[in-house]
């Protein structure tokens, strides 16, 4: 199973989906966007570096799971290599419409490449007390969220 993202300012929303991935699969591969892939984002200067994001992700995995069940790999395209991975059986994604659409697009690329399609597992995003999704963008803007106020 693969779950990919930027994982900037690793937050409870990311952790919720990672936990789901580990419950659903024996092996979890986490694709982490590189700095190069993010260089055109408008708030790029506020996004943690690849090394910082990698370290936070690894620390979280080590604190909750058997590290042997996971891997972290860099991604530099929207597909993150999922369009060419021969042994990929499932992609876990948030319920963000653009992310779900991208998963379907990658599945079509896999078919075009002669590979079997993967299962798309959609996990609802963690919401804040205002009903909006918890996100790294909101955290970068300085919004503060307390774990006891999050809605799963």
Identify what each model region corresponds to.
Residues 1-152:
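Nucleotidyltransferase catalytic core that binds NTPs
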């Amino acid at each position: 199973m693969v779950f990919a993202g930027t994982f900037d300012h690793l937050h409870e929303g990311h952790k919720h989906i990672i936990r789901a991935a580990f419950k659903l699969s024996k092996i979890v591969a986490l694709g982490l966007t590189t700095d190069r892939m993010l260089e055109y984002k408008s708030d790029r200067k506020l996004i943690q570096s690849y090394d910082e994001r990698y370290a936070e992700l690894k620390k979280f995995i080590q604190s909750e799971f058997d590290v042997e069940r996971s891997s972290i790999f860099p991604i530099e395209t929207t597909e993150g290599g999922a369009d060419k991975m021969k042994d990929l059986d499932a992609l876990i994604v948030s319920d963000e419409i653009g992310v779900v659409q991208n998963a379907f697009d990658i599945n079509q690329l896999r078919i075009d490449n002669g590979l079997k399609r993967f299962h798309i597992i959609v996990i609802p995003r963690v919401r804040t007390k205002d009903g909006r999704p918890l996100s790294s963008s909101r955290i970068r803007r300085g919004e503060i969220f307390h774990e006891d106020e999050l809605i799963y």
